[in-house]
């Protein structure tokens, strides 16, 4: 009888431990979703929380290209479409709901400049041609912008090959960004860390 009671108690403890572990796992899964490409998904709330700890760097691919679409061009044929501009504006409004304080940069192409302008709705934009050149030197260029921004959060409009390079170099994953997709990085002690993919919402 005593042996049966001890086994019963142990089984109850095991079940309680198992139930607790499942609750923790479920909680982590709901708070830290993962993209199919292997990158953690970071929404606006998570980004805001990260920005309270370190300066964040959000790198967006430009909006829909006019020269690769049948949609109406915003203006210049080397820029973005009207649809792309509207999407950039909507994304900017959603982004600013969580991150109000940031400096804005773009590469020196019409499509990135237009994307950044519509995203920010009037915020001052600095154009930096180094945001077009993506390779090992991209990190030094980003750190230079952080210093210029006095370690404020920064938003950069750049190109798909830049985002692909960073994802592969920092996390060893293949990232093929669509228009207006973004990566989130943070700076700590002079080093840049890739946190994941920005997912609005």
Swiss-Prot record:
Keywords: Hydrolase, Periplasm, Signal
Any one GO BP annotation for this protein: lipopolysaccharide metabolic process
Signal sequence, renumbered to the chain: 1-35
EC number annotated for this UniProt entry: 3.1.3.-
InterPro entries: His_Pase_superF_clade-1, His_PPase_superfam, LipoPS_heptP_Pase
GO molecular function, one term: phosphatase activity
Annotated metabolic or biological route of this protein: Bacterial outer membrane biogenesis; lipopolysaccharide metabolism
Compartments in which it is found: Periplasm
Keyword Chloroplast tagged: no
GO CC, one annotated term: periplasmic space
Major location (coarse): periplasm
Summary of the function given for this chain in its UniProt record: Catalyzes the dephosphorylation of heptose(II) of the outer membrane lipopolysaccharide core.
NCBIfam families with a match to the protein in the record: PRK15416.1
Annotated family: Belongs to the phosphoglycerate mutase family. Ais subfamily.
Protein name as annotated: Lipopolysaccharide core heptose(II)-phosphate phosphatase
């Amino acid at each position: 009888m005593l042996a049966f009671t001890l086994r019963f108690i142990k089984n109850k403890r095991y079940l309680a431990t198992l139930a607790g572990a499942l609750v923790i796992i479920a909680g982590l899964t709901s708070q830290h979703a993962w993209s199919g490409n292997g990158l953690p998904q970071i929404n606006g709330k998570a980004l805001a929380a990260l920005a309270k700890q370190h300066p964040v760097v959000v790198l967006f691919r430009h909006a829909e290209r006019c020269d690769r679409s049948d949609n109406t061009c915003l203006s210049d044929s080397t820029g973005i479409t009207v649809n792309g501009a509207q999407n950039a504006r909507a994304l900017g409004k959603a982004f600013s709901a969580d991150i109000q304080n940031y400096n804005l940069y773009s590469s020196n192409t019409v499509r990135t400049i237009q994307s950044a302008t519509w995203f920010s709705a009037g915020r001052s934009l600095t154009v930096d041609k180094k945001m077009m050149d993506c390779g090992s030197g991209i990190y030094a260029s980003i750190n230079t912008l952080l210093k210029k921004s006095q370690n404020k959060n920064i938003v950069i409009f750049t190109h798909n090959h830049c985002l692909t390079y960073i994802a592969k170099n920092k996390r060893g994953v293949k990232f093929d960004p669509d228009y207006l997709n973004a990566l989130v990085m943070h700076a700590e002690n002079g080093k840049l860390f890739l946190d994941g993919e920005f997912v609005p919402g």
